[in-house]
Amino acid sequence: MTNIRKTHPLMKIVNNAFIDLPAPSNISSWWNFGSLLGICLILQILTGLFLAMHYTSDTMTAFSSVTHICRDVNYGWIIRYMHANGASMFFICLFIHVGRGLYYGSYTFLETWNIGVILLFTVMATAFVGYVLPWGQMSFWGATVITNLLSAIPYIGTNLVEWIWGGFSVDKATLTRFFAFHFILPFIIAALAMVHLLFLHETGSNNPTGIPSDADKIPFHPYYTIKDILGALLLILSLMLLVLFAPDLLGDPDNYTPANPLNTPPHIKPEWYFLFAYAILRSIPNKLGGVLALISSILVLILMPLLHTSKQRSMIFRPLSQCLFWILVADLLTLTWIGGQPVEHPFIIIGQLASILYFLIILVLMPIISTIENNLLKW
């Protein structure tokens, strides 16, 4: 009798994706983050579902409904903080996952990479609309500032902003539609993640050497299932340490003040995972220029396959490119720090230099260094 997992129409799909999938024998722990992102997504959908059962998307009651969840609902506080800090873990995994793709040249899988960039945009959109829901000061002013950026679009900008707001300011209509978006987007992310996996399994995984591994494959189960379970345990451990010991570490104290349109907070800033893009936005004095730079900071990832001039796929044997990669990581950390600082000297100039360096490394220096490395190897 043949095994049911190989014959049953549904089980066959699961089997080919998670059990009998031929995987390279040498993929390191940097390859764990795809599965961790899946776990983060499931965790966010589940905690979000329970939060939505008690949340009300009305400007008069949104803030107090979140307080009610934390104080009166059984284990509401842990669900709320798992959801808030789960978003941070999601973005940590996301940034490492993208960084891994850049380092090991995984962007040469064009379809997988492009779907991944779309996924990144979608997750960022979801996190943004979600941050508005508690209706604290930073929620309200963050929504006002970021949606207002669309007014920089020539001719249709102002109409577009008012259309998104559902009125002439961020108000009840905005909150209601943001809640609707925040509820539907994770399911769109889940669907896109399946397409992402579908394209990945067409080509098979990359590996640290960047060399085709067709000659040396091992089954996904039990080797990588065990490895993924270890990663998942470490993820849940770090999340629970954050939730139980420092739940407000990554949040903004201003968001514990109910939204007040008449009182602007001294420093409007988004959550930490948007600070690098926010710093790039602020470093350009022109509104439209800032918006274009903001979008380009993520959209530049789509160009990575075109900018790959090296004759080797991975950076593992390219020390000059490695140096440049880690300078880029340091630059992004600098931008994240600058995004959280007030707009004053010396932070303005540091932000501008870091923003220039970011685009310079990706668009100019990396292709040049790769060509130099080719010449050094007489290729």
UniProtKB/Swiss-Prot annotation:
Record's keyword terms, sorted: Electron transport, Heme, Iron, Membrane, Metal-binding, Mitochondrion, Mitochondrion inner membrane, Respiratory chain, Transmembrane, Transmembrane helix, Transport, Ubiquinone
GO terms for MF: metal ion binding; ubiquinol-cytochrome-c reductase activity
Primary residence: mitochondrion
Example GO BP: mitochondrial electron transport, ubiquinol to cytochrome c
PROSITE patterns: CYTB_CTER, CYTB_NTER
Stored Pfam families: Cytochrom_B_C, Cytochrome_B
Amino-acid positions noted as binding a ubiquinone in the UniProt annotation, renumbered to this chain: H201
Signal peptide, first to last residue: none
Amino-acid positions noted as binding heme b b562 in the UniProt annotation, renumbered to this chain: H83, H182
Cofactor(s) needed for function: heme b
InterPro entries, A to Z: Cyt_b/b6_C, Cyt_b/b6_C_sf, Cyt_b/b6_N, Cytb/b6-like_sf, Cytochrome_b, Cytochrome_b_C_euk/bac, Cytochrome_b_N_euk/bac, Di-haem_cyt_TM
Entry GO CC: mitochondrial inner membrane; respiratory chain complex III
Transmembrane residue ranges: 33-53, 77-98, 113-133, 178-198, 226-246, 288-308, 320-340, 347-367
Cofactor binding comment, as recorded: Binds 2 heme b groups non-covalently.
Membrane topology note: Multi-pass membrane protein
Compartment(s): Mitochondrion inner membrane
Residues that, per the record, bind heme b b566: H97, H196
Stated family: Belongs to the cytochrome b family.
Described function: Component of the ubiquinol-cytochrome c reductase complex (complex III or cytochrome b-c1 complex) that is part of the mitochondrial respiratory chain. The b-c1 complex mediates electron transfer from ubiquinol to cytochrome c. Contributes to the generation of a proton gradient across the mitochondrial membrane that is then used for ATP synthesis.
Subunit organization: The cytochrome bc1 complex contains 11 subunits: 3 respiratory subunits (MT-CYB, CYC1 and UQCRFS1), 2 core proteins (UQCRC1 and UQCRC2) and 6 low-molecular weight proteins (UQCRH/QCR6, UQCRB/QCR7, UQCRQ/QCR8, UQCR10/QCR9, UQCR11/QCR10 and a cleavage product of UQCRFS1). This cytochrome bc1 complex then forms a dimer.
Note: Heme 1 (or BL or b562) is low-potential and absorbs at about 562 nm, and heme 2 (or BH or b566) is high-potential and absorbs at about 566 nm.
Protein name as it appears in the record: Cytochrome b
